[in-house]
Amino acid sequence: LGGSTVIPEVSDAMLQANNAYIPLLELQEKAGGMIADLVNVPAAYVTSGAGSALTLATAAVMAGKDDKKIEQLPDTTGMKNEILIQKRQRYWYDRCLELAGAKLVEFGSVQKTLPEDLFNSIGPNTAAVHYFVSASEEDRRNLSLEQTIEIAHARDIPVLVDAAGQVYPLDNIGAYVRMGADFQCVATKYINAPQSTGLALGTSEMIRNISYQSFVGYEGRRVRGIGRPHKVDRQEIVGATVALRHW
């Protein structure tokens, strides 16, 4: 909670950004393209922390590109609003999913999660399946991410991955999207970026829908999504991008 320490290259880049003006829609697009290329994923977006990325991604899977639904959130009446999560994977930060208006639905037991637990839990209101990746050794009593993706995608359900702290080895950044997940968040405070920044990595459709929910989308498109408080300034966008490049 004391904050991260940015490296000199990041602070220098942020200072340069402080003295220049650019439309944030354009800056997010350029930064996202650079980040996506660096980690070999289809698309990326700089957010106000990994928790923000989780909230925006949850809103994105519920509302998509429908402006009426975007403005309706966090009221999810008439929408698919259920996010499935393994009972064994409930954790401190899954609250970020509920902030968008979603309802968390547990599957499996505290002892073990089986493939059929997920299969049988998918219903008409399922918006996505959430998966938490921890730094510890893989727990074989959990349903694996590979199995989760296979089962969910067979029913056209997107998979969201919280891998906020998985920044080492370096290949972890973007690994879960490359594996087939639709979204992965990264907390860039762990890579010498400003503590208040994070990354949303994912498919082009997912990141586009996240952008519609964002602060930039709210002001630039004049569509009132839930992301207005999730502001990222140009200095932070540049700082996070440069930090990733050096990491």
Model-derived regions, located:
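An acidic intrinsically disordered interaction segment
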Residues: 15-27, 153, 160-163
